[in-house]
Every structure is written in C-alpha cells, then in structure tokens.
UniProtKB/Swiss-Prot annotation:
The keyword Lyase applies. The disulfide bond which can form in the large chain dimeric partners within the hexadecamer appears to be associated with oxidative stress and protein turnover. It comes from Senna didymobotrya. This is Ribulose bisphosphate carboxylase large chain. GO terms for molecular function: magnesium ion binding; monooxygenase activity; ribulose-bisphosphate carboxylase activity. Its EC number is 4.1.1.39.
Length: 455
C-alpha cells in the first residue's frame, strides 16, 4: 500500500485547531473573512491558515518529509462580526520559523502573498498582526525614533510643523527652493517634497537637492532654529535611491524621504539602515495605501501597514488627519497612531486593536497629519495628536493671501497659542475657536488666514 493517502481533503481537518494555545513566539493574524455562499466559516478560516503557510490544494508525498505540526499555520478561533452578514474574524497563528529574520517583505509574502485570490472566499481582509518580541528583535526599526529626533532638532513640548510644497509638479528647482526658504523662514520646522516629485524633466533631483539645501541653511541662519526639508529619494532602482540619499548626506541636510509602498519594503529597509548609519532622519509617505486599505472587507487595514513600517524603519509616517479632506475615523486612527508611537499597546477592539503589542523598546515613529487642514483645525489637531506628531499644512500655508512666509507665520502662531492654552489647562475641544481668535488679534498673518478659511 502507498505510504500516504492521496487526494483532496478538507483544510479544516488539519488547519482548524480551536484548542490550540498560542505561543509567545507565534505571529498572530486577525483576518476578516467573507466566505462564498455554502462554505462554512471553519473551512474558510482553515483555508486561509493553510494557503498562507504549509498547505497546498492536495496531499503531496513530500509532506511526509517534514513535521507539519511544527510548521503549519493554525486557525485557532473564529467569531462572527457583529452587525455584518456572513463576515467572520478568523484568528491564525503562524510559527516563527516560517519567516525570514528582519524581512518585512518575506513576512508579507507569506501572510498575504497568495491567499487573497482564494476561490472559497468572497473577500478577505487582514485587520491586525501581533508581532512577537522574538521577531521584532530581528529588525532595526526606525533609524532614530522620536526622542533622538527631538534632540537632533532641539524642539520640545510641541508638535512639529511641516508643509508640502505646491504646485507639486512644474516648478523649476530654483523657484522650488525659493518656496522652501519662504516657508522655513516664516516659522515652519519642515517643508516636504510631494510624493510624486522624484526626478522629472522640469526638475532633476540633484538640482532640487542643491537649491533646497541652500534654502535650509539660509533659513536656519536667519531664524536660529534647526530646519529641514524632506528630500524625496524615491527612485526607479534601489541603487539610484541610495545615490540620492548619499548626496543628501553629503550636503549635510537632516532628513530624506521615501514612498515606502510604491518603493517597496526591501528598498525601504535598505534606506532605513543607511539613514541610521549616517545620521539622516527618514520621512515616510504612504502613497498607494488606499489601494490596499480602503475597502472595508478586502485588502489590509492601514494599521498593519503602519506596524510593518515601524519594523522596516521610518521616523515619520503619514497617518491621516481625523479632520481635513481624507477619510479616517477618530478612534481607529488614534489606535494606529499609538501603535506607531508607544512602546506597549493594550488590545482594544473599540480602537481596532485586535492584539496586545509589545514593541520592546523599538524606537517610535512620529505620525504625520496631512491633507486639507488649516489654522482652524489647529486646536483639534493639537488635542487629538498631542506633542509627538508632525502637522502638515500644504495649501494651508501656501494658500495664504499674502504668500508662503506669512502663511507659515500664521500656522506657527496658531500652534504656539494652542500649546500655551493647553499648558494653562484650557479645553481645546471647547474653546478652540476662541483661542485662535484671541491669537489672531496680535498676529495680522493669522487674522488674514482666519478670514480665508472660515471656521
């Protein structure tokens, strides 16, 4: 007789193990599963566990050459989603040995690489991951982290202010540098390359880097504050990206930028290592995230992409605003903002956090609020995001009727007023508009901004 039983068998016989005790070293995943009609949730959950670990669609003789029990993913719990028809949360545990150390790329290839096109599922969404300490320790994480960044910049006790230079495409390098200088001189801490500014015919990267560096040093000399501009090093190849980062370091600027989803995790991790070794801060933009995270029942939640970035490395990352033009629910956003900044985060389903996550002193990432925000939003932003954040006003700076520098002044005055009011114990949520109005009495720049963007 044959040594094994050939043929197709139900996944749930092998991969659905409700009595499994999860190990501290397991990577745990919470999937939102929508099975096809007639497929039981246990089979759907088990199929996810199988296809993203050791399973294939039929029994194979080489299964006998390994210990499936040691290497298989296990679906250990399934619960229906309240208020949704035919949606379940399937919890899957993966043994640590399935993953290459220090590779976000491999982690994602394993967990979400293949299983999302699966026939038995109508839709599938990865809601959260628990990264065990033993795996976290194989990553360097952010190049510097929040505390080191504050010490480098000598800025404490308030959020940092940024501004994306617009029009994002079409300016010459010299005019671009001019816009940067005006914003920094007016009182912003940072200006930013737009995510699609790489090296186009109207402005090559080297020219932009040179003029922006000049703008930074001039503004620093005039204001006595440390300034930065996120120089976008994203490129078509990793080698070209590194070349740009090296040039930025040679110019002596403090920070570079990368589009981590379009650039890819492998490129991002390389850049992150370079930044730590060479004292550059790394600003991360999440272009393409909505392609992955916008659908409620399919894809990946942004909190997973945020966790992955903290492992791969970045000092700032865009995290939505809770106010402005891009969507984001408050509690859920605050959930992944804390996942980025804090060392230890308790499981809390009301904030979308499915697992308790211990980052074991991996440096934190500053969340960046950006997109359609202006001076009237300042009290809300200060209250919601707190000190450890970057508030970015693109149009909210450059749209000022008097120009960039007064626009920057308006934002800085509004921020300092909010921070002062908060430190005096005033309630920003209730008195926010009043605080801004008071401040605008002694700042004509702020008064003009208040006129343009009505509360």
């Amino acid at each position: 007789s044959v040594g094994f039983k050939a043929g197709v068998k139900d996944y749930k016989l092998t991969y659905y193990t409700p009595d499994y005790e999860t190990k501290d070293t397991d990577i745990l995943a919470a999937f939102r599963v929508t099975p096809q009609p007639g497929v039981p949730p246990e089979e759907a959950g088990a199929a996810v566990a199988a296809e993203s670990s050791t399973g294939t669609w039929t029994t194979v003789w080489t299964d006998g050459l390994t210990s499936l029990d040691r290497y298989k993913g296990r679906c250990y719990h399934i619960e229906p989603v309240a208020g949704e028809e035919n949606q379940y949360i399937a919890y899957v545990a993966y043994p640590l040995d399935l993953f290459e150390e220090g590779s976000v790329t491999n982690m994602f290839t394993s967990i979400v690489g293949n299983v999302f096109g699966f026939k038995a599922l109508r839709a599938l969404r990865l809601e959260d991951l628990r990264i065990p300490t033993s795996y976290t320790k194989t990553f360097q994480g952010p190049p510097h982290g929040i505390q080191v960044e504050r010490d480098k910049l000598n800025k404490y006790g308030r959020p940092l202010l940024g501004c994306t230079i617009k029009p994002k495409l079409g300016l010459s390098a010299k005019n671009y540098g001019r816009a940067v200088y005006e914003c920094l001189r007016g009182g912003l801490d940072f200006t930013k390359d737009d995510e699609n500014v790489n090296s186009q015919p109207f402005m090559r990267w080297r020219d932009r880097f040179l003029f922006c560096a000049e703008a930074i040093f001039k503004a620093q000399a005039e204001t006595g504050e440390i300034k930065g501009h996120y120089l976008n090093a994203t490129a078509g190849t990793c080698e070209e990206m590194m070349k740009r980062a090296v040039f930025a370091r040679e110019l002596g600027v403090p920070i570079v930028m990368h589009d981590y989803l379009t650039g890819g995790f492998t490129a991002n991790t390389s850049l992150s290592h370079y930044c730590r070794d060479n004292g550059l801060l790394l600003h991360i933009h999440r272009a393409m995230h909505a392609v992955i995270d916008r659908q409620k029942n399919h894809g990946m939640h942004f909190r997973v992409l945020a966790k992955a970035l903290r492992l791969s490395g970045g000092d700032h990352i865009h995290a939505g605003t809770v106010v402005g033009k891009l969507e984001g629910e408050r509690e859920i956003t605050l959930g992944f903002v804390d996942l980025l900044r804090d060392d230890f985060i308790e499981k809390d389903r009301s904030r979308g956090i499915y697992f308790t996550q211990d980052w074991v002193s991996l440096p934190g990432v500053l969340p960046v609020a950006s997109g359609g925000i202006h001076v009237w939003h300042m009290p809300a932003l200060t209250e919601i995001f707190g000190d450890d954040s970057v508030l970015q006003f693109g149009g909210g700076t450059l749209g000022h009727p008097w120009g960039n520098a007064p626009g920057a002044v308006a934002n800085r005055v509004a921020l300092e007023a909010c921070v002062q009011a908060r430190n005096e114990g005033r309630d920003l949520a209730r008195e926010g508009n009043e605080i801004i109005r008071e401040a605008s009495k002694w700042s004509p720049e702020l008064a003009a901004a208040c006129e343009v963007w009505k509360e």
